[in-house]
Amino acid sequence: MSMDISDFYQTFFDEADELLADMEQHLLDLVPESPDAEQLNAIFRAAHSIKGGAGTFGFTILQETTHLMENLLDEARRGEMQLNTDIINLFLETKDIMQEQLDAYKNSEEPDAASFEYICNALRQLALEAKGETTPAVVETAALSAAIQEESVAETESPRDESKLRIVLSRLKANEVDLLEEELGNLATLTDVVKGADSLSATLDGSVAEDDIVAVLCFVIEADQIAFEKVVAAPVEKAQEKTEVAPVAPPAVVAPAAKSAAHEHHAGREKPARERESTSIRVAVEKVDQLINLVGELVITQSMLAQRSNELDPVNHGDLITSMGQLQRNARDLQESVMSIRMMPMEYVFSRFPRLVRDLAGKLGKQVELTLVGSSTELDKSLIERIIDPLTHLVRNSLDHGIEMPEKRLEAGKNVVGNLILSAEHQGGNICIEVTDDGAGLNRERILAKAMSQGMAVNENMTDDEVGMLIFAPGFSTAEQVTDVSGRGVGMDVVKRNIQEMGGHVEIQSKQGSGTTIRILLPLTLAILDGMSVRVAGEVFILPLNAVMESLQPREEDLHPLAGGERVLEVRGEYLPLVELWKVFDVDGAKTEATQGIVVILQSAGRRYALLVDQLIGQHQVVVKNLESNYRKVPGISAATILGDGSVALIVDVSALQGLNREQRMAITAA
């Protein structure tokens, strides 16, 4: 029974994406004057693997584009073509077009014909120039396709040494045996086919290169499942006799001549990752999300049982209570293990910036050195995909407005090469991402003047950090002219809003003439939260534990009134704004006298304030439920959760609460 090869499309798409990313990184690292042989080989192998897979799935345009690039790379690694910056740029452009072609195939669309013809002509022209010819290589697409098909056949032909190739595939899944037989049949005529429950062996009648076979099969199985042996041609009777007595054997017991060519073909790329690749599998994100949801329900159930067990007599039910404690520990360990599946390294984000910085710095006429720190730091997949756009905007802003032109840096006594640092590290239950440049820094006077002209409430006594945060106001920009890079005043406010929607906040530190650091703090995950539950009248609210500094009983002498009905609480010489939770959410029956309640000191976006509640309940894990998708967006509330007794509690948006409280008071005063 035959299986549709389209079942393996996604495997090819995923691996091709990884190969293209590797190709770009190696191209960026190449020194044209003295290219590293290993890097050139890695780029060549990536192109060769993509070409083989594209041919298998019938992605002709991608196959032909990759084939032309592969030929040029082969000339470069054999020293027949001298690399330079223009050639590297052309290879990078080819990689971009290959990515566009791959994306088109993902969407079941045909790639753009114009870009295909353009890049093929450019590559063929380069090939002619490398051979000392200057005739333009303008070739019609149809003719190009035919030519490449002929070249592909020619390059796979081995010397006619009257030998055939026998392939042995082992450790196969049941549904792979027929599929692989079909695919091998597409490459050559098969004879002496022997199929087992988990193995397949066959002789290929035709001139097919071993590395081309490996390139195709490795999109379905691993390289160490493939082995080859040469079968010397003989009269029919002898050949038949040989086939009959040759048992199907796994690669481990094949004679030395049957040594797996797959290992030779992939040696440079696979050696460092052999252990990782042999112990990893691809799992759809939807399945991981479903598993996380089930673990979330388990946490809720465990919380319900824990609440019930607290009502039991510890003398009569000691063993049950002990077992409940063990269940709680196991549930937490399970939750942490499952959550780690969704964690991805920041390298996924950082890897796209070397190319961006290189291209944009060249466009702006600046020299910039990019340093990446903490690429292995992990973050939840849902957040890592959403952080790309904000970080991209910050990097572009640093390049355009932060780092000066070379002549200005020389005048300021700086190195002409500017420094841009992207870093990531864990801080408690958060991840801290920083974008740092050693450019001109923020101009305090210009920012204040611009803010005043826009009618913003500012004064000369504001700290440098407070002045810096003004650039995140909607429509705010001090750029003297608008460019296609930045300066339109739309972006920094969107960056801040996007970060806040992810449950994080953004801070800025800048010193004029020395540079700027923009810091982003995000929770590691949005699925499960460590929180402190508090009560206001009959309502329960959850405060994110990483925002809680301390709690205390306020005294009358520490409370001080301000204009507009506001009050501040003095805590060890520091005056903190007092936010009364019952007023913000209009909760009836709450304790209105501050001295009768409890104050929780919270910190968000570098600012501290005091939150008045009736009672502290305790600390525990809660499963975050999206409130907006199930109800509607509520100001001051970030999400909801289900408590152990089955009731719903709201999770407070700590960063928005103080501003919401101020807006309500201003509205009351204006009325």
Swiss-Prot record:
The taxonomic lineage of its organism, from the top, reads: Bacteria, Pseudomonadati, Pseudomonadota, Gammaproteobacteria, Enterobacterales
Identify this protein by name. Chemotaxis protein CheA
Q: How does it assemble?
A: Trimer or tetramer.
| Feature: compositional bias, Basic and acidic residues | 261-278
The terms under GO molecular function for this entry are: ATP binding; phosphorelay sensor kinase activity
For the region Disordered, give the residue spans. Answer: 256-278
User: What is catalyzed by this enzyme?
Assistant: ATP + protein L-histidine = ADP + protein N-phospho-L-histidine
Tell me the ranges covered by the CheW-like domain, including all copies: 528-663
Entry function: Involved in the transmission of sensory signals from the chemoreceptors to the flagellar motors. CheA is autophosphorylated; it can transfer its phosphate group to either CheB or CheY.
Q: Which organism is it from?
A: Salmonella typhimurium (strain LT2 / SGSC1412 / ATCC 700720)
- Chief site of localization: cytoplasm
Q: Where in the cell is it found?
A: Cytoplasm
**HPt domain boundaries:** 1-105
Gene field: cheA
**CDD domains in the cross-refs:** CheA_reg, HATPase_CheA-like, HPT
